[in-house]
Amino acid sequence: MEALQEKRSTGQRWFVRPGRREDCAAVHALIVELAVYEREPDAVVVTVADLEADGFGPNAIFDLFVAEEAGEVIGMALVYEKYSTWKGRCLYLEDFVVTASRRGEGIGQTLFTAVHSLAVSRGVRRLEWQVLEWNKPAIAFYRKIGAELDGEWLNGRIAFDV
C-alpha cells in the first residue's frame, strides 16, 4: 500500500492510518459487528489468519485503513482493486465500519477520505461499494458525500464451501 500519513483531526484523540497485520484481530471483530448489524450474524467465515495472509502476505489482495484511539481499533475500511470492462481499473470498498459507540464523531468521514485518496493516487476511474437498502444511516452518509446510489442493478453471487 502506498505510504499514507496518519490523518489526525484537530482536537481528536483518534486517527486513521494504514492497517497492519497486528490489527487483524480487531478488524475481524469489527467485521463480525458489521455482520450482526446487517442481520447476518453467522455469515462470517473468514478468520484472523485469513485476514493476515490475504492482506499482509507476499500476495496481498486488499488494502486496509483503521481508525485508532489509544491503541484500540475503532473503525476500518477494507478495499481492493477490481476491473470494469466499461471503466477500467476501479477500487471496491468491501467493508466500512465504525464501532457503534463511536459513530457520529467524523471517524467514518476520515476513513472514507483515506479510501478516496488511495483511489485517486492509484488513478482508478471509479470507487464503488454496496449498501443495504434498509441501512438509512449509511445511505444518508453516502448521499451527504455526494455518492451516486443505484437502485437498478441486482447483485448476483454463488457461494463455495472451501
What are these regions (language model features)?
Residues 15-27:
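A short beta-loop-alpha structural element at the N-terminal edge
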Residues 96-103:
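A short, internal acetyl-CoA/4′-phosphopantetheine-binding micro-motif in the GNAT/acyltransferase core
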Residues 99, 110-126, 148:
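Conserved acyl-CoA
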Residues 66, 72-80:
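Conserved beta-strand in the GNAT
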Residues 28-53:
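Conserved GNAT-fold acetyl-CoA-binding loop/helix
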Residues 53-66:
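A short helix-loop-beta-strand connector motif used in the catalytic cores of GNAT acetyltransferases and
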Residues 104-117, 140, 144:
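Conserved acetyl-CoA-binding loop-helix of GNAT-fold acetyltransferases
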Residues 125-162:
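C-terminal "cap" of GNAT-fold acetyltransferases
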